[in-house]
Amino acid sequence: MASLNTLPTGTWNIDPAHTEISFVARHLMVTKVRGKFTDYSATVVAADPISDSSVEFTVQTASFDTGSADRDAHVKSGDFFDVETYPTMTFKATQITDDEITGDLTIKDVTKPVTFSYDFNGVATDPWGATRAGFEASGEINRNDFGMTFNAPLDGGGVLISEKIKINLDLEFTKA
């Protein structure tokens, strides 16, 4: 892991071609369903000290993709994201340390604080002269907190879909 102190100050824009925003939910409490969002934007304004930096993400909720058209259509419906009414979800950092970022996550007009742990993987210059920075982050939310409460109880206990959703981010930014 690189030292965050080596991140040059200034504006950094997400590189969607080298980034993945993914999630994991439990299905029937015995297996995992994985998916990702494919349409998003993000900007980091790195400052010194790092605690003065800003981070903002916008994700297009209709870009939700698990590889199952039927499941994706259900999750995009009013039972979950309601993409027609709430086309985006956003994250805005409120506190940044050397290994955690806390911010306001807004889904379906509900805003809750969320903390992600992260690793800064360093800075590199690509063959075309662009300066790039890489991060890995992970966190967890309770989907019920954001009004996504659809579920069904199971005969043996448990529920159809886990309330806790794990979020994983593999991020690459390009210096503006």
Q: What are these language model-derived features?
A:
Residues 1-176:
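Low-complexity, acidic/polar, glycine-enriched regions of mature
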